[in-house]
Each structure stands twice: as C-alpha cells, then as structure tokens.
Amino acid sequence: MRVCIVPEYPMSLMTGGLQVQAEETCRALNALGEGVSAELFSWSEKRPLPDLYHFVSLPPYLVRLTELVRCAGRPYVLTLLFGGVRGTVRLRRAATRRWIRAHLLRQPGRSDAVQGAAAVVTITQADAVAAEVIFGVSPGRIHLVPNGVDERFFRGSPEVWHRAHGDAPFVLCVGAIQKRKGQLALAEACNQRRLPLVLLGPVLPDEAAYGQAVEAAMSVNSRHGGLWLRDLRNEDDLLVSAHAACRFFALWSVEETQPLSVMQAMAARKPVLLFRAPYTRDALFSGLAFTETLEPDRAAEALQRLWDAPQPTRLDSRFTWPEVARRLRTIYLTACGTKPDV
C-alpha cells in the first residue's frame, strides 16, 4: 500500500514541528515496511495515485485538495490540531462558529473535509474532544496517535556539541522564532540572571519585527555565553547533541498542541521549564517544571531555581517512531478496507 503524506505547508516556504513530523512519518513508515510505503506530496509530480493520503493538519487551502482526492476515489486520513482550544465554553463557541459558517453562510469547507475523512487522527486527548465537539466526529472515527520522537534523542551524546561550542552549561530553546513561542521573554529573563541561552530556529517569514527584538536580546545574552543558530535541521547530529549538552530545556509558548522540541528534551532526560499554558494540562507534561507568569522578575526566578537544582525527566517508549508507525499502519489499512494483522 502506497501512502502519500501531505504536509501542512510546502517544505521550501515554512519550517516547524509539523513539517518535521511529515518527513519523519515517511521515514518511519518506510523503515517499518510490512507492506506499506510512504512518500511526501509533490504538487508537480505525475505518478499513479497512491492508495491513501494522510493530511498532516488541514489549513483552508488544502480543503480543495481533499475534494480532489475524494473525487479520485481515494480515501484520506486527517490529523486535526486545535492548539489552544480548551475548556467547555471555548469548545462550544468554536462549534457554534463552525456551524454558522457551514449552514448559514454556506461555507462548509473544512466541515465537509473532516466528515469525508476515512479516519481522524489527533495527537492529544484534548484534541480528540475538540474534534468531537467542534466537527461532530464520532469517537469511533478518532484515533489518538502522539507525536513521534527520533530514537537518537534517547541515546544522544554531548560530544558533538562540546567539540563545536565548548562544554559550558546553557539553557536550550528549540523552535521557529515567533511571538507565541515566547523566545523574547525567555531571552530577557536569561539576561536578567546572566544565564547563557542557546536558541535553535529560524525566524518565521511574518515575524520579522519579533525576530529583530529577539536578536537584540540575544546580542546581550552572547556576553553571557549564549548563541543563536538559525539553520539547524532536525536530522543534524548537532541538534541531538545540543539536547544532551544543555543544563535544561525551556519553552515559554502560550499556545501549542504537543511540542516536539519538549518531547525531544524529555527523551534526552533533560529538565524542562514550560510556561503554564493550556496545552500543559496534558498528562504528558504533568511532572515538568513551570513558570506561572512571564513577568520578568518571577519568570527569571523560575529559571534560576531549575538552573540551581535541575530535575531530570523521561519519555515513554510509546512516543518512539517505530511505535507511532505501527499505529498509523493499522489506521491506514483499516481506512483502505484491509483487515490489519492481529
């Protein structure tokens, strides 16, 4: 069975966790074998149609593509992500807005795309609830499959990082530079306590002003041993080694679903400091350290506490790519009408 993985955005125009997940899903499925091969979607390639499509997220511009897939007689699977939509009130409001667009404004769009899917995948239980409430997806069509983490992060060594940048301890933050991820607040708090911060990630195209503010803060942090690497890719050994070498990992996002960078840090058994945003209610993050505020003085205190007394974390093996690939294979076979192996 051939499976085509459709990323959220073209790889050449956008970077981020979902693009990484699309690439890694292909690699993991091809490594698994067992009658399934995977490829990334290409707008220009002319080949026989695959047996099934898997859309990793569903931005509006991909809705038309789901219609074409359906017309071609191929099933598709959707991964739905809802980010900060949590709580009964917010879910009901989102469901009402969706109903108005679909039924009063005659703009069914995403609603039809979701209902036409052979299966819906969510990466958290909260997103499974959101899919049911907002889109009316029956629980039997929803499959909970978490993000996968490359097994290299479980056994990483600091040696590559030490050879390139020395063995001084540092705070690590990985992710595309954007306001919702809070890198500026983190850099300013590190500067207040003179803690070296290593930022890994590019500035998103529409976040130039925020990127300039982060650059100014990191210029100050460089006096304390910090640095910013903008072009490190997920498959780079230096990224794995940075996780192994850091004193602890920090991500102060106000909105996420299940951030891959945090899971990579947990796989490396590193202490993690998060801003207590709604997504952190997930049981996966229950044992981590938190800052309750991004107010500079109190946030800096949280940094200092973890720096002085780091507490290691861990990640369960069910988040490894082989395990995720096996679960996806079962979903794909069922969607194509094939009975999975028992």
Q: PLM features: what roles do these ranges have?
A:
Residues G17-V20, G156, D308-P340:
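A charged, aromatic-enriched C-terminal amphipathic alpha-helix characteristic of glycosyltransferases
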Residues E132, G148-R163, A168:
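Acidic anion/phosphate-binding donor-loop and adjacent secondary structure
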Residues R163-K181, A187-R194, V198-L200:
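Conserved donor-binding/catalytic core segment of Leloir-type glycosyltransferases
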Residues V254:
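Aromatic "clamp/platform" in nucleotide-sugar-dependent glycosyltransferases that forms part
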Residues G211-N234:
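Nucleotide-activated donor-binding/catalytic signature segment of Leloir-type glycosyltransferases, i.e.
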Residues P271-L274:
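Short hydrophobic beta-strand element within catalytic cores of glycosyltransferases
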Residues L288-D297, Q304-D308:
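Conserved acidic donor-binding segment of nucleotide-sugar-dependent glycosyltransferases
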Residues W99-V120:
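Membrane-proximal helix-turn-helix segments that form the acceptor-binding/catalytic region
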